[in-house]
């Protein structure tokens, strides 16, 4: 079974849609309580066509609306609201979602690069591909935040994916924490 879709109307005019405004009001409630960031799940599924501009357009409107509100309310002096989206796609398709959000989780870096490199002791192409992805992201947002991670609630823990090896899990953590980007550690990942 599945959950019903929320109807935000056309992405280009979603800012006046009652459903959109209700979502914004819910987020403002939490901003008023002191929340300074949000994680958005499955952002490629807001509108059905994952490769059109509808989802990035919606996300840009949502982020811009909330960021303006946040900037007027921030007692902590933060410049911008932090918002990261889960966009489980290859870099080419994912990159345009940076038109909508400042930060996106990078699933490809873990699945295709780090895990392969660590499991196969071969990573000579990893830095070039990583920098190439970041250059692609910059085409859509100059101030993008590359949200790197090893795992999340939809995946096996990194250590499990690495055959249970403590040494490989430590290597994965070292790569995560020393690579460019803003690393995320899914709770419990730090203990294997």
Where are these regions (language model features)?
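Chitinase-like catalytic core of GlcNAc-active glycosidases
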Residues: 1-32
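Short, motif-level signal for alpha-helix interfacial/capping segments enriched in acidic residues
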Residues: 18-20, 166-170
């Amino acid at each position: 079974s599945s959950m019903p879709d929320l109807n935000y109307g056309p992405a280009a005019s979603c800012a006046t849609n009652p459903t959109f405004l209700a979502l914004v009001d819910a987020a403002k409630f939490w901003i008023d309580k002191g929340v300074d960031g949000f994680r958005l799940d499955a952002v490629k599924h807001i509108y059905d066509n994952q490769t059109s501009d509808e989802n990035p357009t919606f996300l840009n409107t949502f982020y811009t609306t909330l960021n303006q509100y946040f900037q007027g309310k921030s007692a902590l002096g933060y410049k911008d609201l932090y918002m990261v989206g889960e966009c489980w796609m290859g870099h080419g398709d994912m990159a345009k979602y940076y038109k909508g959000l400042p930060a996106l989780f990078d699933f490809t870096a873990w699945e295709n690069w780090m895990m392969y490199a660590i499991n196969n002791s071969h990573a000579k192409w990893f830095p070039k591909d990583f920098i190439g992805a970041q250059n692609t992201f910059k085409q859509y947002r100059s101030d993008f935040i590359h949200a790197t991670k090893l795992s999340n609630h939809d995946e096996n823990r990194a250590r499990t994916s690495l055959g249970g090896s403590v040494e490989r899990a430590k290597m994965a953590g070292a790569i995560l924490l020393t690579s460019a980007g803003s690393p995320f550690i899914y709770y419990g990942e730090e203990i294997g």
